[in-house]
A protein has these predicted regions:
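Terminal or standalone catalytic/regulatory effector modules within metabolic enzymes
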Residues: 4-204
Length: 204
């Protein structure tokens, strides 16, 4: 069974093809480095380490958050964390107004005291409004591809979002994928953008 199918079977995650190719390389590098058979638990740990912030990592196969399972083997997880978000319509109803509270650990993660930031933006939907909001403090990101799906059925269903972002100015931009998981499809989308931004800064 391929890696994509194993993630879909065990964790209800249906990765887009280009994300699948990217993650396959991460798993292959792990296999080449460790010289060991890659088990299902290794795949999930690698996926969490690479794409999911601490608060998203403690999930069952059904996508239910069961607590923080982040451990010392996982890398410190990036600059930004989404604390709260609210979305409303503009005065004429044509635009989306988004307000968010973020925890900003600074560009040099670990070297600065985290700061809570209130940001707001306007766009033709929550994603565009969020990109507008974070651009106000120096984060330049644009969407190249986006996919989403529910992970289960019922009132407690979780949603998964996958986004391919260009992060940074044109001459120094990186193309990276991000993943977000949440009970709200809007919040999962915003978490996927943060995942991509954090990954871009971890890779520098």
């Amino acid at each position: 069974m391929c890696i994509r199918d194993r993630l879909k079977t065990n964790h209800n995650l249906d990765l887009p093809k280009r994300l699948q190719i990217e993650f396959d390389k991460i798993v292959q590098n792990y296999a080449d480095t460790t010289k060991k058979e890659v088990k299902d638990e290794d795949i999930w740990r690698l996926f969490k380490d690479e794409y999911l912030p601490v608060e998203q990592s403690g999930m069952t196969a059904a996508g239910v958050v069961v607590g923080d399972t982040h451990d010392a083997s996982l890398a410190p997880w990036g600059r930004l964390k989404l604390l709260k978000v609210s979305v409303s319509s503009g005065e004429d109803g044509s635009d989306t107004v988004l307000k968010a509270r973020l925890l900003d650990r600074g560009v040099n993660v670990g070297g600065e005291q985290p700061v809570e930031r209130e940001v707001s933006g306007i766009g033709n939907g929550p994603i565009a409004a969020f990109l507008n909001a974070i651009s106000n403090f120096g984060v330049d990101a644009s969407i190249m591809d986006y996919a989403e799906h529910t992970m289960s059925v019922g009132t407690d269903a979780m949603a998964a979002s996958y986004v391919e972002c260009q992060v940074g100015e044109a001459d120094d931009a990186q193309i990276v994928w991000g993943v977000g998981i949440d009970s709200s499809i809007t919040t999962s989308a915003l978490k996927s953008i943060i995942s991509a931004i954090n990954r871009s800064q971890r890779k520098r």
